[in-house]
Amino acid sequence: MSVPDATVVKAFLLDLQNRICAGLEQLDGQASFAADSWTRTEGGGGTSRVLTQGAVFEQAGVNFSHVTGAAMPASATAHRPELAGRSFEAMGVSLVIHPKNPYIPTTHANVRFFIAHKDGADPVWWFGGGFDLTPYYPFEEDVREWHQTAKNLCLPFGDDVYPKYKKWCDEYFFLPHRNETRGVGGLFFDDLNQAGFDKSFDFMQAVGNGFLTAYAPIVERRKETPYGERERDFQLYRRGRYVEFNLVYDRGTLFGLQTGGRTESILMSMPPLVRWQYAYTPEAGSPEAELYDNYLKPRDWV
């Protein structure tokens, strides 16, 4: 079994952050990312990079963090109690993109590595991550292409990989109190270590590198689509689901807050503007109704 090497993972993550920011700046064509580096008193730090008020992106945040601690927090040991009390290192790149145009979907991606140490014992480590898409208006072409890209990057690792992580994504990004998925899913994986370090790292890299391949064509296709107040209002209303999920259910958000992480970076995923409306119901036969009827539940897209 190959030996875990946090140094090579960190180098990949820093390079990935640079490449994704460059790609998003190119797609936007106007705004650029501002970098904000920070250190954590308990150990570690990171760099948050944020683009605001661009031509295409209202807000895009791409965060790198590498934090260390003497004891693992409750959120990380809830499903692995044997790890309680171990020291840990956690590193990752996490991003959320909120476009201006309601016809461009919001998206989220994350790749991460976790390693826990204990004197006299082998380190316990795993990779996690994925990417998911949250459209406001239904375009089957976009969703099928998104999932095809996800499936293609999984195929070298086995025929069962895409169906497994696609299903996990549908289950993870689900709002029980709304009885709907957050969007149309993608990939979600966690606790990945069974194949050994090298192969597990290869898969995490494939997911990180595949994100822009999946997202950029959708942005290019939709960024010039005209929209009005109705579409903007619906976009802001649906953004509320993002806030609800991240603050109530998301493991990464809860982990960051429980470990004394940097609040500005953790809440960077929040949309800059959002609205709630009491007892909203989409008009029958409308594109908004189609989103509810056909897109906010698990489907086999490819």
UniProtKB/Swiss-Prot annotation:
Alphabetical UniProt keywords: Cytoplasm, Heme biosynthesis, Metal-binding, Oxidoreductase, Porphyrin biosynthesis
Compartment(s): Cytoplasm
GO-annotated molecular function: coproporphyrinogen oxidase activity; metal ion binding; protein homodimerization activity
Catalytically driven reaction(s): coproporphyrinogen III + O2 + 2 H(+) = protoporphyrinogen IX + 2 CO2 + 2 H2O
GO term, biological process aspect, one: protoporphyrinogen IX biosynthetic process
Region (Important for dimerization) location: 242-277
UniProt-annotated binding residues for substrate: S94, N110, V111, R112, G260, G261, R262
Binding site for a divalent metal cation: H98, H108, H147, H177
Keyword presence, Nucleus: no
Cofactor entry: a divalent metal cation
Pathway: Porphyrin-containing compound metabolism; protoporphyrin-IX biosynthesis; protoporphyrinogen-IX from coproporphyrinogen-III (O2 route): step 1/1
Entry-linked InterPro entries: Coprogen_oxidase_aer, Coprogen_oxidase_aer_sf, Coprogen_oxidase_CS
PROSITE patterns to which the protein is assigned, alphabetical: COPROGEN_OXIDASE
Active-site residues, record numbering mapped to chain: H108 (proton donor)
Pfam families associated with the record: Coprogen_oxidas
Enzyme Commission no: 1.3.3.3
Site residues by UniProt (Important for dimerization): H177
This protein's GO CC annotations: cytoplasm
Cited function: Involved in the heme biosynthesis. Catalyzes the aerobic oxidative decarboxylation of propionate groups of rings A and B of coproporphyrinogen-III to yield the vinyl groups in protoporphyrinogen-IX.
Family under the similarity heading: Belongs to the aerobic coproporphyrinogen-III oxidase family.
Protein name: Oxygen-dependent coproporphyrinogen-III oxidase
Organism (species): Shewanella sp. (strain ANA-3)
